Amino acid sequence: YVGQRLCGSQLVDTLYSVCKHRGFYRPSEGIVDQCCTNICSRNQLLTYCN
């Protein structure tokens, strides 16, 4: 997922993969700006984990 734009189900699947058993909270529109409109890093994704 590094260097890709992640949108919709691809973004959700990637969050499941990154957060694993911790799960993640329902992100606000900010994650769409970070990961769908732009490219986000693994560290940015980790900020959405519980």
From Swiss-Prot:
Cystine crosslinks: 7-36, 19-49, 35-40
A Pfam family that the UniProt record links to this protein: Insulin
Keywords: Carbohydrate metabolism, Disulfide bond, Glucose metabolism, Hormone, Secreted
GO molecular function ontology, one term from the record: hormone activity
Keyword Iron-sulfur tagged: no
Gene Ontology biological-process entries: glucose metabolic process
Main location class: secreted
One GO cellular component term noted in the UniProt record for this chain: extracellular region
InterPro entries linked to this entry: Insulin-like, Insulin-like_sf, Insulin_CS, Insulin_family
Domain of life: Eukaryota
Cellular location(s): Secreted
Family: Belongs to the insulin family.
UniProt function note: Insulin decreases blood glucose concentration. It increases cell permeability to monosaccharides, amino acids and fatty acids. It accelerates glycolysis, the pentose phosphate cycle, and glycogen synthesis in liver.
Subunit structure: Heterodimer of a B chain and an A chain linked by two disulfide bonds.
Protein name, UniProt field: Insulin
Species of the source: Proechimys guairae
Higher taxonomy: Eukaryota, Metazoa, Chordata, Craniata, Vertebrata
Gene name of this polypeptide: INS
